[in-house]
Amino acid sequence: RVPGLEIQALYGYRACNIFSFKGMKEIKRFNPEVIHVQTEFGIGIFGRIAAEYLDIPVVYTYHTMWTDYSHYINPINSETVDTVVKKVITKISKFYGNSCQGLIVPSNKTKDALIHYGLKQKNIYTIPTGLELERFSVKNKNNELCQSLIEKYHLQNHFVLTFLGRIAPEKSITVIIDALKKV
């Protein structure tokens, strides 16, 4: 494990140095066939340095559409700053994607966005993460359970909307709420 500093403001993200002699020594001793990086920062940079130095292929999982998070580094909410930040993010994403031997993305939407950014990567693999949507299909609805919850919480005459996820601006929860006002 590479030492890091927890950043509470970023949901407990741990920032670490981009290089560790001890970590490099351990990777060299372990002699992996592939290095899998799952972040563009800190430990991800270290993984890429180790892969380059030890001539090991890199597989990179692109988890986050960073352009959706530009507001976190644009506290003045400037359109110009946002445009510049998004261009930088696109360039970084393109560089990282083009410099690995395999790229894993969570959706075809992400894959299409990265190709739009200019990735030349031929080894892009879509591996969905997150919810098993079929579990929430209407065909799997448990009417007895639904009815018991409606009765338990006295919801017979109420419209109920459920959101499962982290509450953050990029989730656009207010868009749903505003749209429901118009229905």
What is each stretch, according to the model?
Residues K109, G130:
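Carbohydrate-associated surface elements
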Residues E144, H154-K171, I177-L180:
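Conserved donor-binding/catalytic core segment of Leloir-type glycosyltransferases
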Residues V37, I104-V105:
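Short beta-strand scaffold positions
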Residues S137-H154:
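A short helix/loop element that forms part of the nucleotide-sugar donor recognition site in Leloir-type
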Residues G4-A9, T61-K91, E134-V138:
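Acceptor-binding helix/loop patch of EC 2.4 sugar-transfer enzymes
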Residues Y53, T83-G102:
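Membrane-proximal helix-turn-helix segments that form the acceptor-binding/catalytic region
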Residues G4-I35, T39-I49, Y53, K87, ...:
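An amphipathic, basic-hydrophobic alpha-helix
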